[in-house]
């Protein structure tokens, strides 16, 4: 839809003029030109008002009053009235409905020589420093080298600036960064000290660390192998002790203990204790050795292993079987056996002790006595030999008898007095009523 342009209304003294009806091609020419004003005579005083007017067809062509500016040569142009100039308004009517065409510019090209060779660079003088020589990274390397060569890591900044031939502010750039990451500290006004690590150490330290790492790896592998062996042995030992066929063999003999080479010419005491028994050995004195055993699970049994070579003429040697053994240990005993200064402690059904050399076969035992009629038992108390078989531990060697704290009976008891008995109403103290112990208690 085409709208008529707004016109300027003249004063009342002048006649009103309007634009003729024009087609769009006459109103909007394609050419661009500066507007031309038609000479006209108007009144000196007038006022303007903007309003929309109809365009009658009676106006003749070529009238330039109140017309929109167009090109020359028969085209309608806007004529300004004489006197006061109209207000300037910028109307961009040419760009309405038309695509914007960018302004054409000449492309810029690179200057290429005809021969295709680059222009030669101006050579620098021999004394001129390159950019790399004056870089802060290279200056830092030189500064750290001076710091490593200084005594105790203390460096004078004035001397460093003279040696490096740089301004002191560049040295401060380096020291500020190193101080910020806590590698140096300010010792005085112009002295700094290195507080980092691995600057003044042996240069062979990395190779030493690598060697130690390899040794540590080998030790870890060896430890892992030992753990596997211990686990395998523990499992095998558990199966061995839980087997019912092996429980009857859960004992150790005196000969087995005496056959150990480390126990020769030493006093050996075998200890049979329940699980979780606590053994304490205080600091050993010059000649004495003290051992403390404590158990909350049951009684502790202690056995003194005899030395067979000290008593060759013992009367009980023939009657003592060669396989005299300790009492079997309960099934709940846990594995463990410790020896300390001639002390053998047996806590386990099967003790890991080397097998001894079998002793020579003992002499044959005397034949069992034949059955005796009941009437012949009346004179049994008159026999010269003892009724009960005596064992080796009932005889004291001369060496032990001299230092023994036990008091022997004087005169010795007869055979009749060994046959004691108690009634249902008697206690253990009644056994000693038949013998006068007054003299022994006084002494």
UniProtKB/Swiss-Prot annotation:
CDD domains: E2F_DD. A motif (DEF box) lies at residues 162-198. Residues 361-443 are annotated as: Transactivation. The keyword Cell cycle applies. Keywords: Activator, Cell cycle, DNA-binding, Nucleus, Phosphoprotein, Transcription, Transcription regulation. Residues 1-22, 306-341 are annotated as: Disordered. Phosphorylated by CDK2 and cyclin A-CDK2 in the S-phase. PANTHER family: TRANSCRIPTION FACTOR E2F, TRANSCRIPTION FACTOR E2F2. Residues 199-291 are annotated as: Dimerization. Transcription activator that binds DNA cooperatively with DP proteins through the E2 recognition site, 5'-TTTC[CG]CGC-3' found in the promoter region of a number of genes whose products are involved in cell cycle regulation or in DNA replication. The DRTF1/E2F complex functions in the control of cell-cycle progression from g1 to s phase. E2F2 binds specifically to RB1 in a cell-cycle dependent manner. Residues 416-433 are annotated as: Retinoblastoma protein binding. GO terms for cellular component: nucleus; Rb-E2F complex; RNA polymerase II transcription regulator complex. SMART domains: E2F_TDP. The lineage of its organism: Eukaryota, Metazoa, Chordata, Craniata, Vertebrata. Component of the DRTF1/E2F transcription factor complex. Forms heterodimers with DP family members. The E2F2 complex binds specifically hypophosphorylated retinoblastoma protein RB1. During the cell cycle, RB1 becomes phosphorylated in mid-to-late G1 phase, detaches from the DRTF1/E2F complex, rendering E2F transcriptionally active. Viral oncoproteins, notably E1A, T-antigen and HPV E7, are capable of sequestering RB protein, thus releasing the active complex. Binds EAPP. It comes from Mus musculus. This is Transcription factor E2F2. Residues 109-198 bind DNA. GO terms for molecular function: DNA-binding transcription activator activity, RNA polymerase II-specific; DNA-binding transcription factor activity; protein dimerization activity; RNA polymerase II cis-regulatory region sequence-specific DNA binding. The keyword Cell wall biogenesis/degradation does not apply. It is found in: Nucleus. One of its GO terms (biological process) is regulation of DNA-templated transcription. Residues 67-107 are annotated as: Cyclin A/CDK2 binding. Belongs to the E2F/DP family. Residues 157-178 are annotated as: Leucine-zipper. It holds the Pfam family E2F_TDP.
């Amino acid at each position: 839809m085409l709208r008529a342009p707004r016109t300027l209304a003249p004063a009342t003294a002048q006649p009103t003029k309007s634009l003729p009806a024009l087609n769009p091609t006459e109103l909007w020419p394609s050419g661009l030109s500066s507007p031309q004003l038609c000479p006209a005579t108007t009144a000196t005083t007038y006022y303007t008002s903007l309003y929309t007017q109809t365009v009658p067809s009676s106006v003749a062509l070529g009238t330039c009053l109140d017309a929109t500016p167009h090109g020359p040569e028969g085209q309608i142009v806007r004529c300004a009235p004489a006197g006061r100039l109209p207000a300037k308004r910028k109307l961009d009517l040419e760009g309405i409905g038309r695509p914007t065409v960018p302004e054409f510019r000449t492309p810029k090209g690179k200057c290429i020589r005809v021969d295709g060779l680059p222009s030669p660079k101006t050579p620098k003088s021999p004394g001129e420093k390159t950019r790399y020589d004056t870089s802060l990274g290279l200056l830092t390397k030189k500064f750290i080298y001076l710091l490593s060569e200084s005594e105790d890591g203390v460096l004078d900044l004035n001397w460093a600036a003279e040696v490096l031939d740089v301004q002191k502010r560049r040295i401060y750039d380096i020291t500020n960064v190193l101080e910020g990451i806590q590698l140096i500290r300010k010792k005085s006004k112009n002295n700094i000290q290195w507080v980092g690590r691995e600057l003044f150490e042996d240069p062979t330290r990395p190779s030493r660390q690598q060697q130690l790492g390899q040794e540590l790896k080998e030790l870890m592998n060896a430890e892992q192998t030992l753990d596997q062996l211990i686990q395998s042995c523990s499992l095998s030992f558990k199966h061995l002790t839980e087997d019912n066929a092996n429980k009857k063999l859960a004992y150790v003999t005196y000969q087995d203990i005496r056959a150990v080479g480390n126990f020769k010419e030493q006093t050996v005491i075998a200890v049979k204790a329940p699980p979780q028994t606590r053994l304490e050995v205080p600091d050993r004195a010059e000649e004495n050795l003290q051992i403390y055993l404590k158990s909350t699970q049951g009684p502790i049994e202690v056995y003194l292993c005899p030395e067979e070579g000290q008593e060759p003429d013992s009367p009980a040697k023939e009657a003592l079987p060669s396989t005299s053994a300790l009492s079997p240990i309960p099934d709940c005993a846990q594995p463990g056996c410790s020896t300390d200064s001639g002390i053998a402690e047996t806590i386990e059904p099967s003790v890991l002790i080397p097998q001894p050399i079998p002793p020579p076969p003992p002499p044959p035992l005397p034949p069992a006595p034949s059955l005796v009629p009941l009437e012949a038992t009346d004179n049994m108390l008159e026999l010269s030999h003892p009724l009960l078989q005596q064992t080796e531990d009932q005889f004291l060697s001369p060496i032990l008898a001299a230092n023994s704290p036990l008091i022997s009976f004087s005169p010795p008891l007869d055979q009749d007095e060994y046959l004691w008995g108690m009634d249902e109403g008697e206690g253990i103290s009644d056994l000693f009523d038949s013998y006068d112990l007054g003299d022994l208690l006084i002494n």
